[in-house]
Amino acid sequence: QTLIPMPRL
């Protein structure tokens, strides 16, 4: 399972 943090807008 690969977790990718969402980029801050």
From Swiss-Prot:
The keyword Secreted applies. The modification Leucine amide is found at residue 9. Signal peptide: none annotated. It is found in: Secreted. The modification Pyrrolidone carboxylic acid is found at residue 1. The keyword Secreted applies. Keywords: Amidation, Neuropeptide, Pyrrolidone carboxylic acid, Secreted. GO terms for cellular component: extracellular region. One of its GO terms (biological process) is neuropeptide signaling pathway. Mediates visceral muscle contractile activity (myotropic activity). Belongs to the periviscerokinin family. This is Periviscerokinin-1.
